[in-house]
Amino acid sequence: MAIKKVLVVDDSTADLVNLQEIIADAGYLVMTAASGHEAIKKAQAESPDIIFMDIVMDSMDGYQACRELNQNTKTKDIPVVFVTSKNQKADRMWAEMQGGKALVSKPYTADQILEQISRFQ
């Protein structure tokens, strides 16, 4: 599948802008969301090819948003890559159990983010 549209989800404006710049500079169309609820709405409306999502967010965390995306027939095939400061082995296992396809630890490099896009091309 060719990745063209990317949804970035983070409640930290600094992290959201940083990810957006990395991905947009590589030539991809980037949409953003600041919460799990907003991510679900945008994913349903815009059908991104991949989602980069923070885990620790207010009201709905990334795990819950990922579970809901995976239960929806319209969004269940969109790969979710968690981008988070939670980087223990248990965090990686839990992320996978919630339906995440990968986990990138903060702080990250542009290459680590773009490598994840390449994995799903």
Spell out what each predicted region is:
Residues 16, 58-59, 76, 88:
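The feature encodes the CheY-like receiver
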Residues 27-34, 42:
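Short hydrophobic/Thr-rich beta-strand motif most characteristic of the beta2 strand and flanking loop
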Residues 46-52:
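Active-site beta3 strand of CheY-like receiver
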Residues 108-117:
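C-terminal output helix
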Residues 54, 106:
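A Lys-centered signature of the CheY-like receiver
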Residues 17-25:
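Charged docking surfaces used in two-component/phosphorelay signaling
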